[in-house]
Amino acid sequence: MSDQQLDQHELQQEENKLIAQRKEKLAAVREARAIAFPNDFRRDAYFADLQKQYADKTKEELEAAAIPVKVAGRIMLNRGSFIVLQDSSERLQVYVNRKTLPEETLAEIKTWDLGDIIGAEGVLARSGKGDLYVDMTSVRLLTKSLRPLPDKHHGLTDTEQRYRQRYVDLMVNEETRHTFRVRSQVIAHIRRFLSERGFLEVETPMLQTIPGGAAAKPFETHHNALDMAMFLRIAPELYLKRLVVGGFEKVFEINRNFRNEGVSTRHNPEFTMLEFYQAYADYEDNMDLTEELFRELAQAVLGTTDVPYGDKVFHFGEPFVRLSVFDSILKYNPEISAADLNDVEKARAIAKKAGAKVLGHEGLGKLQVMIFEELVEHKLEQPHFITRYPFEVSPLARRNDEDPSVTDRFELFIGGREIANAYSELNDAEDQAERFMLQVKEKDAGDDEAMHYDADFINALEYGMPPTAGEGIGIDRLVMLLTNSPSIRDVILFPHMRPQA
């Protein structure tokens, strides 16, 4: 057994010992009272609200006012005379007043452990150092914790353990709690932003008979009652556009997508996406709307449009760069010429050399995108709208009027990561049917991510869809930026993990 394994074994033995001791204490609680886990305590204040409301009250003013409060929280520190509690908002001290608390309560307090949850009544007071606290007149145990909190000196520092036991991570790491509060703020702000502009929030199917709306490999399941194969959705796009056909001219959805692909710092098989569609608009309108949204989000969450991330700062207050796929390759790779990019064989050779997985049947447009992904994408630090994607890789986007080989599409990159994907929607039913057939050929040639043919969607387009622009924004990656989080797992409460050995 290695030294590390020995240390782990000793730690586990110590933890088991502590758990056994706590179970003995719980047994004593069960014996002493009829209800070991009471549910009749009602608090009337959160710690953060108390700190804010009484911030300007002096020690003498609080003493004269004798403000009664009922608070509850988890014991994070026990200093004898003072117990530090934590609720969902903040930490606050409660004072173990030996003059006012009964002897039996004082004796019970000595048996409590870190992690236990208590409810306390008392009056607000301020210490000589200026700290607000509750001078307890009564207190009782609400929940006995059977497992010890992580060591107070080291905390929960193992990254994988933080992801696997997020409930412990949230207990002991304020930074984690802050991240998920910000995530909630971001989603709430997006909803408000779109609702104020006339968008209707909708819900579309998570289980679909035909996975569509993105180039991705789906999760497959089986509907027993209907005896049919179904798929977890990879995107809501085709259903949202059906709603535009039906007359809802501005719609959005914030919900989960599922893609049966790899796990990395940027990818989780289950992730949250915002998709929105607006009739009588194009992809340039969406660029303007996206810039406005991102600036508002940064200002609301950070109080500034300068977004720190690692050792960089992204400037959301400045105009986002707008550059085509073709021009971006030339700009960031001066050794590549326009003639090279317009020659299939030369483009294939460049893509192979760059490390792209070239199968041999790709057209020029797809090869150009492969080159972009390998040689340009990671260099796009400040916000970039990359536009005019080839139609081969944009089966749902409208062709550009001046150059039909490309589409009216953009992807937004920040910090070398794709954050959003948008385009003027293809509303020509015949063109869409042809592109679906091209995707079917790609799938038959071995491309697992190529789209299926969706006859009902073609049927919907044949009724007529107004000129429309649509966009998808990855909520998880956006929250990563706004919370300075290096991994997507840091912003998903319960990320997918490999089984433990």
From Swiss-Prot:
EC number in record: 6.1.1.6
EC category: ligase
Catalytic activity line of the entry: tRNA(Lys) + L-lysine + ATP = L-lysyl-tRNA(Lys) + AMP + diphosphate
UniProt-recorded Gene Ontology molecular function terms: ATP binding; lysine-tRNA ligase activity; magnesium ion binding; tRNA binding
Cofactor: Mg(2+)
Chain positions recorded as Mg(2+) 2 binding sites: 418
Top-level taxon of the source organism: Bacteria
HAMAP family: Lys_tRNA_synth_class2
Protein name: Lysine--tRNA ligase
Gene that specifies this protein: lysS
